[in-house]
């Protein structure tokens, strides 16, 4: 599976071949085909595994009460996954692009992340951590874009990147940007 993540991250879904995955993994192509009849089957298995990673990060975040604490916990959980297996996080970023290029591909990870952020923002409005006039849909999209952008940036660098430091900076930007609004509108 690791080789498949890496090849798809480098080449994209359309250019990925079983031959390249087999070569990279040290398996024969017939062995790969035994487990996955088609490239689509393999991609679905990778997506399922990546989706489990996303839902695990969301579960970790939901252990916290305050909005910013949840968001920070989610970011920290994704960074922890990055340190264990950057190819999975890179795949999550690429899966987002692939869902645009190939609308027939499933995008459950996108829906799960957006759903989590939507819940996060709507609960923040209910708890008055954000003002009642907050454009919730736009804020969800902004947060999603920031998280996705951080992952894309870290995943596509051709040099070492300290993802944890970048994540902390993102958390500071989000915290400093949201906290003053909360104080002002109470």
Q: Where are the model-predicted features located?
A:
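Hydrophobic alpha-helical segments that form the core
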Residues: 134-153, 165-173
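Short, basic, alpha-helical segments at the C-terminal edge of helix-turn-helix-like DNA-binding modules
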Residues: 48-54
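Short alpha-helical scaffolding segments that buttress acidic/His motifs in well-ordered protein cores
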Residues: 75-78, 92-96, 143, 147, ...
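Helix-turn-helix
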Residues: 6-41, 45
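Hydrophobic alpha-helical connector segments
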Residues: 45, 59-88, 136-143, 167, ...
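Short hydrophobic clusters on alpha-helical segments that form packing/core surfaces
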Residues: 3-8, 78
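Short secondary-structure transition hinges
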Residues: 77-122, 129
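Hydrophobic alpha-helical bundle segments that form small-molecule/ligand-binding pockets
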Residues: 64, 112-139, 146, 177-185
């Amino acid at each position: 599976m690791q080789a498949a993540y890496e090849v798809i991250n480098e080449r994209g879904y359309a250019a990925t071949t079983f031959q390249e995955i087999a070569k990279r993994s040290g398996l024969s192509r017939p062995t790969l085909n035994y487990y996955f009849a088609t490239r689509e089957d393999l991609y679905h298995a990778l997506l399922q595994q990546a989706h489990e990673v996303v839902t695990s990060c969301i579960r970790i975040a939901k252990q916290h009460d305050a909005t910013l604490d949840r968001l920070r916990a989610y970011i920290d959980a994704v960074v922890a996954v990055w340190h264990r297996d950057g190819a999975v996080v890179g795949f999550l970023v690429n899966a987002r692009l692939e869902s645009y290029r190939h609308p027939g591909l499933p995008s459950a990870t996108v829906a799960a992340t957006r759903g989590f952020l939507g819940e996060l923002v709507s609960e923040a409005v209910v708890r008055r951590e954000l003002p009642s006039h907050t454009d919730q849909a736009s804020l969800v999209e902004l947060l999603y874009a920031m998280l996705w952008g951080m992952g894309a940036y870290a995943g596509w660098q051709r040099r070492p990147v300290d993802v944890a430091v970048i994540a902390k900076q993102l958390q500071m930007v989000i915290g400093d940007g949201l906290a003053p609004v909360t104080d002002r509108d109470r």
